[in-house]
Amino acid sequence: MPRARKGNTLRKGGQRRGGGARSSAQADSGSSDDEAASEARSTASECPSLLSTTAEDSLGGDVVDEQGQQEDLEEKLKEYVDCLTDKSAKTRQGALESLRLALASRLLPDFLLERRLTLADALEKCLKKGKGEEQALAAAVLGLLCVQLGPGPKGEELFHSLQPLLVSVLSDSTASPAARLHCASALGLGCYVAAADIQDLVSCLACLESVFSRFYGLGGSSTSPVVPASLHGLLSAALQAWALLLTICPSTQISHILDRQLPRLPQLLSSESVNLRIAAGETIALLFELARDLEEEFVYEDMEALCSVLRTLATDSNKYRAKADRRRQRSTFRAVLHSVEGGECEEEIVRFGFEVLYMDSWARHRIYAAFKEVLGSGMHHHLQNNELLRDIFGLGPVLLLDATALKACKVPRFEKHLYNAAAFKARTKARSRVRDKRADIL
């Protein structure tokens, strides 16, 4: 994608209200409480030499001899790449899963640059001739390759070579829903990172839009769409990938999309799938945010009806829904309703290492969630060391801290205990103000 376009969009969508990042003296190795764990997308291996537990441990273990460990890792990665062309489907799937783990947890740009053509050919065969899980894993690895290689000629070449296959699998109604789901995510992320031509962006938007638009009802926004349960995940992934690309879309395209999609998108709020309802709600909030960026006094004709639906979802107490789903839905739609009505997005803070990332817009939330989905537990490592992510989120150059600096930044245990105790007390007070005082009522 064009660097100027991405930079302008992110300043507009992510930092206009003071969002950004700054160094922090408080280390927090855990992830944000509200971050959802990525879905497991792996298969059991039939190739113990490639997918043993020791192989996985070597990808994320403590660094003892960094150079020696890097050499061992590269040797294993060479084996994985060689196994991508094995005759056994299970061996290929095992190699793809091992590559996925490695690319999510480490930065390997030099290794990948040397083998990008080999990897592109292997992934092309997996997407063309593979079935189901193999296609899904190949698409996931492609998305990670785009994150590793970043924007520029090499990343763009890789994306262009495999984009037609992603579109083909995604558009094939006979393909596995899991494969189509991962192709939708890879298409959105790859286009966001590597596409430099506006026509690539427009074509990817159209392809993703066609996936969820075909399930709109025929009777207007009040008609519930009929979506097979097996396709709920696919529609959620396509909608989220489409929303990701909206964050870099030119204003002229945004205007057409608002006219075409905003009146119809609320239909998905009545879906039986909580994930699809949440994806639709967050996308609606993003569309309102983009619309108000274009026109400060933006007015939506069916505002009252939309807010009524959002309010119902924000207070849903149906017992037939799982408690965790109800809690997640209410939390999300309270934020969506607040944003649609008042135009403000609740700020979220993500701490990693000695740094802090502030997210104060729906555009920034969507971008973070897209990378989090593919990187999983490796998200913090990439935020600290991946120049692409640091550029996108405005984190500046990679911090180089020696042992002395690390020791100086480390907070004493007693001070950390006092800070956590004060934060816990403040959080308890804040929550108690909005809880139902049933004892007082009785």
Swiss-Prot record:
UniProt note on tissues of expression: Expressed in many tissues including heart, brain, placenta, lung, liver, skeletal muscle, kidney and pancreas.
Function statement: Ribosome-binding protein that acts as an inhibitor of mRNA translation by promoting ribosome inactivation. Associates with the P- and E-sites of the ribosome and inserts a C-terminal helix into the mRNA exit channel to preclude translation.
Keyword Glycoprotein: no
Family: Belongs to the IFRD family.
An annotated GO cellular component: nucleus
Molecular function per GO: ribosome binding; translation repressor activity
Top-level taxon: Eukaryota
Feature: compositional bias, Basic residues: 1-15
Single biological process term from Gene Ontology: negative regulation of translation
Subunit structure: Associates with ribosomes; promoting ribosome inactivation.
Biased composition (Polar residues): 43-56
Region annotated Disordered, chain positions: 1-71
Name of the protein this chain belongs to: Interferon-related developmental regulator 2
Keywords associated with the record: Translation regulation
